[in-house]
Amino acid sequence: MSLEDVRKQNKERVVEAALKCFSVNGIENTKVSDIAKQGGITERSVYRYFNTKADLVLEAALLFWAQSVEKSKKVYARTQHDSLPGTEQIRLVLKAYADQYFVARKELLFIQEAEAYLSRNNMIHLIRNDLPSDFYKGITPLAKAILKGIKDGTVKCSEERAERLYYNSYDSLLGLMQKMANTPADSPSMNPGEKERLDEFCDMLTDYFCR
């Protein structure tokens, strides 16, 4: 393994450790020494790759989005979507995204904290949020599903409105998941059940594409 490969591997290890520490303990309660310990490297090595804690927060946030995109793609690939109409593909993709609430709840709260933290450090513009990426690039499963629906006629709204709904769907679903993650389990808003609430929200978003 070349020296460059070792450095790349070490940097990735630091970012993975940072994401875990920030998600479990919160950004403010996490010290660089905690990240170094989690990653099995020295604190000095962490600073070799990242100048500030804010740089680590940024890279950890970008790692989470990259992982989210890959998970979404895998879910999309595992399901036989080709025979389904576009609107049903939209529904499945949104519900797959909503599943993050159950498997990455702490990470979702980290993202919420990270956006505020990076904003205070004038770095919020550096979040190249891959979810969602540009609609017309058709890279994300949701964009592919919408474009399929436009082509097969199951998406009834205009293409311009479909593009707006694409961004609004991701942002509103993320907001709901973060809100639910911050809500006590005995709150009245949680009575319908977490999965039921998310499923109904995804159904509601899907219906907007049919109008």
Residue ranges and their predicted role:
Residues 96-99, 140, 144-152, 167-211:
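C-terminal peripheral helix-coil segments that are non-catalytic and often amphipathic
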